[in-house]
């Protein structure tokens, strides 16, 4: 487990992200009454060390660090109170301080009506001991819902962690495990009695089961694929199953902070961008139209039934084997309403189902490859709020020979519902563009793209009618024109390319000779057999089904207000076609006829834009108060109390750079660790003049013993004079112009406020000498009280003194004495450098100054 779980980073109260587990109302409740908060809470002067500082994202009733005795009083400056240090959170069943949190601090998925009703039903189980909801801990439900937004979309890729390949669902399980261990200390909550599976396996099954339940509440969302991406795998030798993505557009897993944190066994420092996902959910309110009906069939008004036998116009009986759909709706009331008194000869597709959303690239990338002509005419919107995108995937049942009696007519009835009441009184028009492969052209004239623009009218009205009044009466449904003439030609040409393999399999199925040894769809074949099937599948003759899949069509729906002449594009309907004769793993299979539709988005969840926008990094919510008011150390607590009583604690004549940096050593006391150097917020006595001068004269000789050097170091400097830096270097250390952001002391544990560029104002790099050239020049100066406790080692002092020569100084002789460095290097084998730190204990030297305090809040 990462050391970051034992050495928590400081989190200011203004930054702490601690959502309460109660989502039963519109917003969750906070733990405390914020009507009157002490300085710690209101001015960001300090932060509490209680609760679960290891997991700032999820609240838990966890006390202070076990390394600190419970009876030890906490340091406190006079302007603070004990309540801010030892405040106990209110339990869920005690609505003592009920106060709604801002909506932007709650996961937006909790506000989706279907999921909210489900959570309300689950709330009744929380009060029962043996039925404590899905997770039996509300924090784990919060972690699950957040992980849906946090986990990157992986497509067909896997993330290697712990010697195993992890998919997205497995990573969600690992995230919940990490939160569970950080809050509860173990994963025992996932254990199921009388089960031989490990805790990890039981937890993954629970996550997978809960995922399937939660998915159903969001299936109608336009942004569903941003939350639950489809994990369809491309099978070789399959029909119409590949979705195209550019690998260079996908964000690398190595740079993802969530996956990096899980690989290190710690809780991620980032959180979901609730505002961004709220915008994605808001796309649902911009839906203007919704598919209602999609039927394509051939009918005839001249075919008559006599004695249950159909006769054409020449009184010739029609063969039922050639027209199997003749009697499909004779004895039922489920016949198409638009059929009227006509006789149905063949039905290509009728049923309409909805599937989950996807990115528009799944369509356009295929067109870019197979139909570049129509791809060039496509003008996609730049944002999803500008225009609605949806896809209609029609699976057609081709007729065997497509020879219909005279008087037959192909009808395509596509109807959409206008869901926006403001558009129901508009005028509507449709612009259709279609392209097909050269094999499906009936004449030598092979136009590149078929284009047709026509108005959308009520039944019985058309563009040729001069007194059209379709817009005078509101209409909830509109009939989208379908290019029936073009499709009659396409379907007639497609039957000229027969599908021998599917026909052979259909005959075997009819004769009942479909034996298992001939149907190897589910068998485990060797690689040689797969290669042979792949080669034969690639060499097979072109079929009508293959050509139908290459037909591309889209329709733009435009509307115009009655009192305006400006047309606005309301939606684009993308059409994808295939047939019932399909392939799966080089084997012919059959799929039922029907049409499925889904929402499409311009925004791609696989893109770098989304994966960077979906996360909120620690610096995103930083405030100036957080930078100027870090946590005071125990020494600063005591100094503030002493100076308030005896003298002035702040002298305006003294530069801020002269404040002594007294830091605590790494003694394991998390409550007393100095995470930063001094209060930037002056105490109440800042403006009072004390009886003793607090200034420091740089020109005072070292013999006076006045300075910011500890007495032990000063004594050693007087008794053992040595070489030191010149006055120019020491003057640069004290006289450099600094800012409040530069006042960052050295710390022995992780200091999120530390930065290598901090020394730019103090010029620390020119005033320090290290025993090794490979030492990081970005390290701060040594802490004299911490070095004073080091024991002296024999022989180490000569090695240290012989390697580096320093110039004598008139001011800082006590600081750079050779004997003093020799005493400090005793326990470090001749080097005063601190011991090697673990990953989580090192100084964050990679964080820029403007983001230093941000790292502390997460």
Swiss-Prot record:
Q: What induces it?
A: Expression is positively regulated by flbD.
Query: Where in the cell?
Result: Nucleus
Please give the InterPro entries that the UniProt record associates with this protein.
TEA/ATTS_dom (IPR000818), TEA/ATTS_sf (IPR038096), TEC1_TEAD_TF (IPR050937)
- Look up the record and give one Gene Ontology term from the biological process aspect: sporulation resulting in formation of a cellular spore
List the residue ranges of the region (Disordered): 1-22, 500-535, 792-858
Arranged from A to Z, the UniProt key words for this protein are: Activator, Conidiation, Nucleus, Sporulation, Transcription, Transcription regulation
Where's the motif Nuclear localization signal? 514-521
From start to end residue, where is composition biased (Polar residues)?
A: 809-822
Q: What molecular functions are annotated in GO for this chain?
A: DNA-binding transcription factor activity, RNA polymerase II-specific; RNA polymerase II cis-regulatory region sequence-specific DNA binding
Q: What happens when the gene is disrupted?
A: Leads to abnormally shaped phialides and abolishes production of conidia.
A single cellular component GO annotation: nucleus
**Which Pfam families does this one have?**
TEA (PF01285)
**Biased composition regions of type Basic and acidic residues, renumbered to the chain:** 500-522
UniProt DNA-binding residue ranges: 128-221
The protein's job, in short, is: AbaA and wetA are pivotal regulators of conidiophore development and conidium maturation. They act individually and together to regulate their own expression and that of numerous other sporulation-specific genes. Binds to the sequence 5'-CATTCY-3', where Y is a pyrimidine, making both major- and minor-groove contacts. Plays a pivotal role in conidiation by regulating cell cycle pathways and other conidiation-related genes.
Report the family membership.
Belongs to the TEC1 family.
Designated name of the protein: Conidiophore development regulator abaA
Q: Organism, per UniProt?
A: Gibberella zeae (strain ATCC MYA-4620 / CBS 123657 / FGSC 9075 / NRRL 31084 / PH-1) (Wheat head blight fungus)
């Amino acid at each position: 487990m990462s050391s970051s779980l034992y050495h928590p980073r400081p989190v200011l109260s203004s930054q702490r992200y601690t959502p309460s587990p109660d989502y039963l109302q519109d917003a969750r409740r906070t733990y405390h009454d914020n009507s009157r908060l002490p300085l710690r809470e209101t001015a960001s002067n300090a932060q509490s060390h209680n609760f679960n500082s290891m997991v700032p994202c999820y609240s838990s009733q966890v006390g202070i660090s076990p390394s600190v005795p419970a009876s030890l009083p906490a340091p406190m400056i006079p302007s603070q109170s004990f309540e801010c240090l030892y405040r106990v959170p209110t339990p869920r069943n005690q609505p003592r301080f009920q106060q709604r949190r801002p909506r932007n601090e709650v996961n937006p998925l909790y506000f989706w009506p279907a999921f909210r009703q489900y959570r309300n039903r689950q709330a009744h189980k929380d009060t029962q001991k043996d039925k404590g909801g899905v997770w039996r801990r509300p924090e784990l439900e919060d972690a699950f819902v957040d992980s849906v937004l946090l986990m990157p979309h992986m497509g067909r890729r896997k993330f290697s962690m712990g010697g195993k390949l992890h998919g997205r669902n497995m990573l969600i399980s690992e995230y919940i495990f990490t939160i569970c261990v950080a809050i509860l200390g173990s994963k025992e909550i996932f254990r199921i009695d009388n089960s031989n599976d490990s805790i990890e396996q039981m937890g993954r099954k629970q996550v997978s089961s809960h995922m399937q339940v939660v998915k159903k509440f969001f299936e109608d969302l336009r942004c569903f694929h941003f939350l639950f991406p489809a994990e369809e795998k491309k099978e070789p030798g399959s029909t119409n199953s590949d979705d195209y993505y550019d690998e260079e557009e996908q964000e690398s897993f190595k740079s993802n902070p969530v996956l990096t944190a899980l690989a290190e066994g710690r809780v991620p420092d980032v959180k979901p961008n609730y505002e961004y996902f709220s915008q994605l959910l808001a796309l649902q309110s911009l839906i203007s139209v919704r598919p209602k009906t999609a039927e394509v069939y051939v009918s005839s008004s001249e075919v008559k039934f006599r004695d249950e036998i159909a006769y054409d116009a020449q009184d010739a009986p029609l063969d039922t084997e050639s027209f199997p759909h003749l009697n499909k709706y004779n004895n039922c009331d489920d016949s198409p309403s638009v059929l009227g008194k006509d006789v149905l000869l063949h039905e290509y597709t009728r049923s309409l189902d909805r599937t989950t959303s996807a990115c528009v690239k799944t369509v356009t990338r295929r067109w870019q490859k197979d139909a570049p002509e129509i791809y060039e005419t496509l003008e996609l919107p730049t944002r999803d709020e500008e225009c609605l995108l949806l896809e209609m995937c029609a699976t057609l049942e081709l007729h065997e020979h497509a020879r219909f009696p005279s008087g037959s007519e192909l009808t395509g009835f596509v109807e959409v519902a206008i869901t926006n009441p403001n558009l129901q009184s508009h005028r509507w028009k449709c612009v259709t563009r279609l392209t097909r492969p050269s094999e499906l052209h009936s004449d030598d004239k092979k136009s590149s793209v078929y284009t047709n623009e026509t108005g959308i009218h009520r039944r019985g009205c058309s563009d040729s009618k001069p007194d059209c009044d379709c817009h005078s009466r509101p209409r909830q449904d509109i009939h989208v024109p379908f290019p029936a003439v073009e499709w009659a030609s396409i379907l007639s040409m497609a039957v000229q390319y027969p599908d021998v393999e599917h026909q052979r399999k259909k005959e075997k199925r009819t004769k009942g000779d479909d034996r298992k040894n001939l149907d190897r769809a589910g068998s485990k074949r060797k690689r040689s057999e797969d290669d042979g099937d792949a080669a034969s599948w690639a060499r097979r003759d072109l079929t009508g089904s293959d050509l139908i899949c290459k037909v591309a069509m889209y329709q733009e729906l435009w509307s115009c207000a009655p009192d305006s002449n400006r047309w606005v594009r309301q939606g684009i309907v993308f059409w994808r076609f295939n047939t019932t004769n399909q392939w799966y793993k080089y084997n012919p299979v059959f799929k039922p006829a029907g049409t499925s539709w889904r929402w499409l988005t311009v925004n791609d969840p696989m893109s770098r834009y989304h994966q960077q926008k979906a996360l909120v990094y620690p610096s995103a919510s930083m405030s100036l108060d957080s930078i100027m008011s870090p946590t005071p150390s125990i020494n600063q607590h005591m100094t503030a109390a002493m100076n308030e009583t005896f003298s002035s604690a702040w002298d305006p004549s003294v530069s801020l750079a002269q404040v002594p940096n007294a830091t605590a050593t790494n003694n394991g006391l998390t409550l007393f660790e100095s995470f930063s150097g001094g209060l930037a917020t002056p105490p109440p006595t800042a403006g009072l003049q004390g009886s003793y001068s607090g200034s420091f004269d740089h020109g005072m000789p070292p013999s006076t013993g006045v300075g910011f050097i500890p007495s032990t170091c000063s004594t050693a400097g007087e008794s053992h004079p040595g070489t030191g830096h010149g006055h120019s270097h020491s003057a640069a250390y004290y006289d450099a112009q600094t800012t409040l952001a530069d006042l960052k002391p050295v710390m022995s544990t992780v200091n999120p406020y530390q930065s290598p560029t901090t020394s730019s104002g103090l010029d620390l790099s020119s005033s320090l000498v290290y025993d090794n050239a490979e030492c990081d020049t970005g390290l701060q100066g040594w802490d004299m009280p911490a070095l004073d406790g080091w024991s002296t080692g024999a022989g180490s002092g000569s090695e240290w003194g012989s390697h580096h020569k320093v110039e004598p100084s008139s001011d800082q002789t006590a600081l750079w004495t050779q004997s003093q460095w020799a005493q400090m290097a005793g326990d470090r084998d001749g080097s005063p450098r601190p011991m090697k730190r673990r990953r989580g204990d090192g100084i964050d030297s990679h964080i820029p100054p403007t983001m230093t305090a941000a790292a502390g809040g997460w």
